[in-house]
Amino acid sequence: MRYITAGESHGEALIAVIEGLPSNLLIDEEFINKELKRRQGGYGRGGRMAIEEDKVHVLSGIRNGKTIGSPLTLEIINKDYENWKNKKTPEVTRPRPGHADLAGAIKYNQRDLRNILERSSARETAARVAVGSVAKLLLKELDIYVKSKVLEIGGVKAEEKWRRTIDEAKSKGDTLGGIIEIVIEGVPVGLGSHVQWDRKLDALLAYHVMSVQAIKAVEIGLGFEAARKPGSLVHDEIYYDEERGFYRKTNNAGGIEGGISNGSPIVIKAAMKPIPTLLKPLTSIDINTKEEVKAAYERSDVTAVEAAACVLEAVCAWVIADECLKKFGGDSIEELKKNYDAYLVYVKNF
């Protein structure tokens, strides 16, 4: 499978086109809309979330609620577009440290930074959540589920202190990042491969996780902690039971060994940096005058860690769904499930 997204933050709509879905997959629009609503939630979000009410509209690829094998096109209307379509906006010439503004302007020869920030905005992730929701619907057919939880916000692990931490940052005109854990349950042994670097499952997951705006680090299993311990305390010993088959009592590998899923839950941690748009802007340089200035301010969140958790679920669901289709094949959901069930029997009898 593959997908692309299109659209700008304050454009008329966001679009996603998914190619390669099997036919007869039920597209539950209510579920997709619930996922989109999750992305809009979380304490510390900005004023944009009071404007938008993200809903998916399927433009192509289904009949009677099910996929038909052709490209699936999803649309999400930007309600804020109505506030911008006739508005003459001044050029943005003061790049924000930590954002794509300056590097993007130089790369694409743009003197108005809005031409960069409109697409680089995390608003694009609404389209990816819609795509990931479709992937989740496919995985549900195989009893595979993706979930997440926020572990830290602004370096604070205690959930009951997060609101106060966010409020303090807001009062200072600052922003906060955090750490998110994603767990994928029900993944069979055998997704990914050791035979080529670009087929390794952990590499694919890390690539997609790092593609999400503001994500700066990723760990799988013990991650960096594995580098601090001897091998005897890191590697998961292997056991066998007639009912369970091969299994491990620990999961330091995070469900992946040698680039291949090993049947344990896949565990990923991702670090999100603070949002680059600060109410009290940092020092920058005006690209036209070359004078020292304060960076531009765009309406933004104090933190979006909880929203990012939903986005990370989506991109991880996409990777696992795509790998399932690569391994088990099937032009229809029925064929995919038949192949998958046969594989599970093979694994049980290995």
Swiss-Prot record:
It is an enzyme of class 4 (lyase). GO terms for biological process: amino acid biosynthetic process; aromatic amino acid family biosynthetic process; chorismate biosynthetic process. FMN binds at residues 119-121, 213-214, 258, 273-277, 299. PROSITE patterns: CHORISMATE_SYNTHASE_1, CHORISMATE_SYNTHASE_2. This is Chorismate synthase. Keywords: Amino-acid biosynthesis, Aromatic amino acid biosynthesis, FAD, Flavoprotein, FMN, Lyase, NADP. Disulfide bonds: none annotated. Pathway: Metabolic intermediate biosynthesis; chorismate biosynthesis; chorismate from D-erythrose 4-phosphate and phosphoenolpyruvate: step 7/7. The keyword Flavoprotein applies. Homotetramer. One of its GO terms (cellular component) is cytosol. Gene3D superfamilies: Chorismate synthase AroC. The gene is aroC. It catalyses: 5-O-(1-carboxyvinyl)-3-phosphoshikimate = chorismate + phosphate. It comes from the Bacteria. This reaction introduces a second double bond into the aromatic ring system. Its EC number is 4.2.3.5. Reduced FMN (FMNH(2)). Pfam families: Chorismate_synt. PANTHER family: CHORISMATE SYNTHASE. SUPFAM superfamilies: Chorismate synthase, AroC. Coiled coil: none annotated. NADP(+) binds at residues 39, 45.
